[in-house]
């Protein structure tokens, strides 16, 4: 295996592109109907629009049909390894996007981390390896 690319379900692709570019420093490298590819240095994130409301009127037992049902938006998370976590935290903190239960802290598994939530409540955790 070579890499992993998170694919995050979002309710409004344009709003989410703005968030990831304006708040987190990503650059839009590809966009088509309901799908976007964003990059920041070597980190790539895919966004896909989950805005299908048809599930509300389906009569069968399974509401998932297209895989883009609106209730899927905001159900994902990913972790992004960074250098300079303290500086990144100081940059992001005043933006008002930190997860309400997060702070910059050292974890017992030798990582320093914090988390943000996007407009749909997908969880994005940033971490840096630390030496114990």
Curated annotation (Swiss-Prot):
Residues 1-129 form the VOC domain. InterPro entries: Bleomycin-R, Glyas_Bleomycin-R_OHBP_Dase, Glyas_Fos-R_dOase_dom, VOC. SUPFAM superfamilies: Glyoxalase/Bleomycin resistance protein/Dihydroxybiphenyl dioxygenase (SSF54593). Keywords: Antibiotic resistance, Plasmid. It comes from the Bacteria. CDD domains: BLMA_like. GO terms for biological process: response to antibiotic. NCBIfam families: 156720500_bleO (NF000027). Belongs to the bleomycin resistance protein family. Binding protein with a strong affinity to the bleomycin family of antibiotics, which confers resistance to these antibiotics by preventing the bleomycin-induced DNA breakage. This is Bleomycin resistance protein. It comes from Staphylococcus aureus. The gene is ble.
